[in-house]
């Protein structure tokens, strides 16, 4: 203080520094308020957009899903049988072959393949619910296939229209419940839950929706070609590209594939096949809820559910356990390389996970034959005159 009295020139710089600090604090506070106000205005505008321009159940810009949904909406009353699932339905069940084989068994059916590549448990169920919200008037049977995974939404998918469109409040809550009711650890549940956060936020903020609804949707030439092919074959798309990495790996690793088939069968060359489903079947609570939800959705549409376990090398036995526990009533399972060797021989496979066209025809005929034998009560309604 004495130095300031003796040296008054020191006071002014100190006051200037304090004044500058106050101005900076004031500006920071002002910018913070403006930023918060801007964010609030953005969220309100996004919400109002959602109210003024309601989002369609399935937008027109979703690869694979939109073309199938549009065809279905235009022709749904022509069908009495629908197939839902992943690529193991999309590229392995041929409606024309199924209908023909069913006719040979005395049944008159008209089916459509609603399989979509890379579908998993949650989004498969969501799609089923969306499609059957307005079911065909003559719907009798719905076949459902899915791997009951952990519920993870891959990060690369988070910003895609295919993931964003279904992450509304209702469906995201369903995904959260599926994860929370699983047997995963708390840290794993946190990771799984977080994977749905970004597509949920994008959906709520209507990212890209204004343009997708006001402007015509466009697909790549390849996507349009594929859509034209599966539209012409009632939703089925044959895997035939010999240049894909999956195909090349399969061709170059035949022995590894055959070894995996042996493991699936529970045997080696000198050991008999051993049933892989244990006597004490178990299914986690979240999977029970999901399968019940699928069955309830199908029955609410006036049809009966049939679950399919395709010929794959996955060792999970969720559908078999569900059947043992009474969670599902009807299951067609083909994960037995001894009972169905024709579905596992390399000449009928496209890659490790999928059948080729010849294998798909064989698989489809088996489904039609087994279906005709397992559901006589409902099938009687569809008998040929």
Can you annotate each of these PLM segments?
Residues 84, 88-180:
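Membrane-embedded segments
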Residues 317-385:
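C-terminal regions of proteins
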Residues 91, 117-123, 282-285, 311-318:
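Acidic-and-aromatic substrate-binding clefts and catalytic sites of carbohydrate-active enzymes
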Residues 1-31:
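N-terminal Lys/Arg-rich, disordered targeting/topogenic segments
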Residues 160-289, 293, 297, 384:
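Secreted/periplasmic serine-hydrolase-like ester/acetyl group-modifying domain
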Residues 93, 97, 123-126, 174, ...:
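Extracytoplasmic/secreted proteins, especially bacterial periplasmic and envelope-associated proteins
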Residues 42-109, 126-127:
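Membrane/wall-proximal cationic-aromatic binding patches
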Residues 113-115, 309, 335:
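Residue-level recognition of beta-strand->loop/alpha-helix junctions
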């Amino acid at each position: 203080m004495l130095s300031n009295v003796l040296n008054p020139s020191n006071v002014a710089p100190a006051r200037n520094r304090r004044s500058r600090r106050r101005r900076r604090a004031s500006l920071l506070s002002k910018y913070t308020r403006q930023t918060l106000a801007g964010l609030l205005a953005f969220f309100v505008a996004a919400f109002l957009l959602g109210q003024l321009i309601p989002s369609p159940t399935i937008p027109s810009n979703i690869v694979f899903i939109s073309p199938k949904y549009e065809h279905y909406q235009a022709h749904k009353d022509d069908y009495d049988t629908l197939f839902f699932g992943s690529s193991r339905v999309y590229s392995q069940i041929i409606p024309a072959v199924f209908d023909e084989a069913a006719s040979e068994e005395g049944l008159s059916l008209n089916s459509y393949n609603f399989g979509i590549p890379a579908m998993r448990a949650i989004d498969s169920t969501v799609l089923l619910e969306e499609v059957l919200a307005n079911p065909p008037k003559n719907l009798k049977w719905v076949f459902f296939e899915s791997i009951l995974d952990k519920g993870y939404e891959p990060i690369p998918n988070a910003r895609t229209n295919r993931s964003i469109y279904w992450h509304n409040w209702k469906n995201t809550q369903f995904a959260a419940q599926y994860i929370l009711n699983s047997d995963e650890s708390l840290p794993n549940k946190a990771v799984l839950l977080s994977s749905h956060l970004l597509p949920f936020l994008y959906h709520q903020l209507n990212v890209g929706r204004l343009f997708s609804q006001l402007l015509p949707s466009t697909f790549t030439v390849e996507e349009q070609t594929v859509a034209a092919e599966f539209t012409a074959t009632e939703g089925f798309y044959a895997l035939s590209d010999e240049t894909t990495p999956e195909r090349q790996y399969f061709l170059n690793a035949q022995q590894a594939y055959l070894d995996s088939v042996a493991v699936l069968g529970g045997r080696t060359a000198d050991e008999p096949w051993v049933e892989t489903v244990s006597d004490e079947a178990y299914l986690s609570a979240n999977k029970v809820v999901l399968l019940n939800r699928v069955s309830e959705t199908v029955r609410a549409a006036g049809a009966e559910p049939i679950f399919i376990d395709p010929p794959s090398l996955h060792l999970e036995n969720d559908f078999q356990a569900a059947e043992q526990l009474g969670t599902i009533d009807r299951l067609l399972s083909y994960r037995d390389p001894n009972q169905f060797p024709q579905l596992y021989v390399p000449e009928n496979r496209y890659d490790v996970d999928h059948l080729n066209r010849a294998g798909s025809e064989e698989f489809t005929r088996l489904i039609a034959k087994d279906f005709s034998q397992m559901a006589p009560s409902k099938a009687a309604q569809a008998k040929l005159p």
